[in-house]
Amino acid sequence: MTYRCLLPMVLLLCFSTTALSRSYSLLRFQQRRSAEVCQKLLGQLHSTPQHCLEAKMDFQVPEEMNQAQQFRKEDAILVIYEMLQQIFNILTRDFSSTGWSETIIEDLLVELYGQMNRLQPIQKEIMQEQNFTMGDTTVLHLKKYYFNLVQYLESKEYNRCAWTVVRVQILTNFSFLMRLTASLRD
């Protein structure tokens, strides 16, 4: 008796997971809300004097990021996922010189992780289907961009001014993320 009920339950669970993973409207809502929380948390981090921003470098955000409306949903998912993953990795580095609240950073990391968790099933589906065009080249450009941010932090020995510059870059990234998220429609 138990086995007869088990098969329909497993099938229902598999179907609902697939159906949920492709519900872009729900995903858009969840991602937008979470990105707003991340922006708010980043805004709560103590800033340093204005002179730190004068030392900023031109990190050259990939050109494609200025054309978010041209991304297909699948490409947008790949790009959003990559950006979140890279931001997460940066924020797990040594920020002790900043005086930032560890609680705020932990909350930020939890939000980022939650966003990546929601995106991962769709991201995996897209990668398996190899159903991407613009996203794959943009991801390569993003990796270079984030590599440059990490190199900058390392060259400045993770000092407070370097973190201020990177924090501003990450805040700018969330503007891009919001635009990309807005393009997710069923």
Swiss-Prot record:
Role summary: Has antiviral, antibacterial and anticancer activities.
Signal peptide start and end residues: 1-21
PANTHER family on file: INTERFERON BETA, TYPE I INTERFERON
Protein name in the entry: Interferon beta-3
InterPro entries: 4_helix_cytokine-like_core, Interferon_alpha/beta/delta
CDD domains found in the cross-reference section: IFab (cd00095)
A GO MF term: type I interferon receptor binding
Coiled coil: none
Family matches, as Gene3D superfamilies: 1.20.1250.10
Family from the record: Belongs to the alpha/beta interferon family.
Alphabetized UniProt keyword annotations: Antiviral defense, Cytokine, Disulfide bond, Glycoprotein, Secreted, Signal
Organism: Bos taurus
GO BP term (any one): defense response to virus
Subcellular location: Secreted
Cysteine-cysteine disulfides: C52-C161
